[in-house]
From Swiss-Prot:
Gene3D superfamilies: Cell division topological specificity factor MinE. Keywords: Cell cycle, Cell division. This is Cell division topological specificity factor. It comes from Aromatoleum aromaticum (strain DSM 19018 / LMG 30748 / EbN1). The keyword Cell division applies. One of its GO terms (biological process) is regulation of division septum assembly. Prevents the cell division inhibition by proteins MinC and MinD at internal division sites while permitting inhibition at polar sites. This ensures cell division at the proper site by restricting the formation of a division septum at the midpoint of the long axis of the cell. Belongs to the MinE family. The keyword Chloroplast does not apply.
Amino acid sequence: MTFLARLFGEKKKTAEIAKNRLSLLIAHERGDGVPKVDFLPALQRELIEVISKYVPVNSDDIKVHLDKQNNYEVLEVNIVLPEQNQGR
């Protein structure tokens, strides 16, 4: 083990998790009187289309959830990416 590896530690597990799963959180303040638009199904379909251009995914691999917390709406998008076997 090299000096730098001992000093900073190995982040192999974290890198694997990040590679296999992408999570995105978006929060915005919702004002009163703004009509609610049900965009989640369309968003999920479009995410599948875009991500499928780069990696093979199906609709079960993408979860979209909208949560309300006080005056904020939190949009959570979880994408499970397929594992890639890389010989190193």
